[in-house]
Amino acid sequence: MAQRYDDLPHYGGMDGVGIPSTMYGDPHAARSMQPVHHLNHGPPLHSHQYPHTAHTNAMAPSMGSSVNDALKRDKDAIYGHPLFPLLALIFEKCELATCTPREPGVAGGDVCSSESFNEDIAVFAKQIRAEKPLFSSNPELDNLMIQAIQVLRFHLLELEKVHELCDNFCHRYISCLKGKMPIDLVIDDREGGSKSDSEDITRSANLTDQPSWNRDHDDTASTRSGGTPGPSSGGHTSHSGDNSSEQGDGLDNSVASPSTGDDDDPDKDKKRHKKRGIFPKVATNIMRAWLFQHLTHPYPSEEQKKQLAQDTGLTILQVNNWFINARRRIVQPMIDQSNRAVSQGTPYNPDGQPMGGFVMDGQQHMGIRAPGPMSGMGMNMGMEGQWHYM
C-alpha cells in the first residue's frame, strides 16, 4: 500500500464510511508513507513520483498505458471496497501496538487491544449495513479483503500475547525482588563466620605457643628439683582411668575461660576482645567444650547439632560452620604440634606421648607430667601421670 487511504482525496479515508477519523487521532498528519523501492513484483502505484518511470517509458506507449490502467483499476477496487476502512483500522492498531507505550493507568491505553477491535467491528457492521452492503460484486476481491483482515487480526492477537508474557515476566521478577529474602541473616552469618574464624585463629595460635613455653618452665623446674615432682604437686598420683577423667575436667575448665598467658598486657587483651565474633562467649565455650570432649571424632551429628543450637541459642547453620572452622583452626594445629613434639623428642613411647597443655583461669599452668626420664620434655601424659601446677 504505497500511499495511505486517507491521503487520497477521492476516497476520503475513514470519513467515507461514517467512522470519525479522530477516534484514534491522525497518526499521518505530520508524516507520509515512504516509498518502497525493494518490491519487484510490479511497478509502483504512482510511477510519476519514482525513478522507475524510466522502465515504463522504455516500453511501448500502448503496453505502458494498459498496465497503468490495470493497476489503477485494481487500486480503485481495493480502496473502494466496503471492507477497506476496517482493514486500514486494524492495520493502524497493529502499528500502535508496537510503537505506543503501554501504561495501564493512562486513558485510551487499550486502543490497540483485540477487545477494542471487536467493538470496532460491531460499530462498523451497524454503520455499513445502513448505507451499503459489506461485499462487492467481485468475489475474489471480497475473499482477498477478508483474508487480509484475518491476517492482521491474528497478528494483533500475537502482539497481545507477547505483551502479556512480558508483563507476566516483569511482575514475577519484581515480586521475587520484593520477596522476603533473608539477606540480613545471610550477612550476619557471614560476618559471624569471619569473626569466629579470626577468634579461632587467635586461640589456636595460643594453643600452639603454649607447649614451648611450658617446656621451658618444665626444664627449669626439673633442674631445680632433680627430676622429682615439685612440692606443689601434693603427691596426687592416679591410675590411667582416674587420670583420663581428671584430664576431661581440666579441659572443660580450660574451655570455660581460655587464656594466652599474656593477660597482663592490656593491649593484647583488648585486641583479643575486639577480634571476638558476634557469637556469645557462653555459646563459644559450650561448642569448644563439646569439641575437646570429642577430639577423636569432632563431627557432631544432626541431632547433636540441633541440641547444641538449642543450648547456645545459635542456628544450626552457625553451629555447623563453627565446627567446620574449629576442625581446621583448632584440632589440626594440635595434631601437628603433637607430631612435631614426637619427632623432636625421643622415639615414640606409648607410656609418654607428648600432648599440648592448657591454662586455667587463675593463670596457673596445668601440665601432665610422667615421672622418669620423659619429665624433661614438659607436657607428657603417661600411665602413671600426675598433676603438676607450675
Swiss-Prot record:
Subunit and partners: Interacts with the N-terminal region of PBX1 to form a heterodimer which binds DNA including a cAMP-responsive sequence in CYP17. Also forms heterodimers with PBX2. Forms heterotrimers with PBX1 or PBX2 and a number of HOX proteins including HOXA9, HOXD4 and HOXD9 where it acts as a non-DNA-binding partner. Also forms heterotrimers with PBX1 and HOX proteins including HOXD9 and HOXD10 where PBX1 is the non-DNA-binding partner. Heterodimer with DLX3. Heterodimer with HOXB13.
Coiled-coil positions:
none
Q: What is this protein called?
A: Homeobox protein Meis1
Q: Where is this region: Required for transcriptional activation?
A: 335-390
Q: Could you give one GO CC term from the UniProt record?
A: chromatin
Subcellular location(s) of the protein: Nucleus
Instruction: Return the annotated region ranges for Interaction with DNA.
Output: 299-329
Q: Where is this region: Disordered?
A: 190-279
Domain of life, source organism: Eukaryota
The entry's DNA-binding region feature spans 272-334
Taxonomic lineage: Eukaryota, Metazoa, Chordata, Craniata, Vertebrata
Ubl conjugation recorded as keyword: no
GO biological process assignments: angiogenesis; animal organ morphogenesis; brain development; cell growth involved in cardiac muscle cell development; definitive hemopoiesis; embryonic pattern specification; eye development; hemopoiesis
Question: What functional role does this protein have?
Answer: Acts as a transcriptional regulator of PAX6. Acts as a transcriptional activator of PF4 in complex with PBX1 or PBX2. Required for hematopoiesis, megakaryocyte lineage development and vascular patterning. May function as a cofactor for HOXA7 and HOXA9 in the induction of myeloid leukemias.
Q: Which gene encodes it?
A: MEIS1
Q: Which disease is it linked to?
A: Restless legs syndrome 7: A neurologic sleep/wake disorder characterized by uncomfortable and unpleasant sensations in the legs that appear at rest, usually at night, inducing an irresistible desire to move the legs. The disorder results in nocturnal insomnia and chronic sleep deprivation. The majority of patients also have periodic limb movements in sleep, which are characterized by involuntary, highly stereotypical, regularly occurring limb movements that occur during sleep.
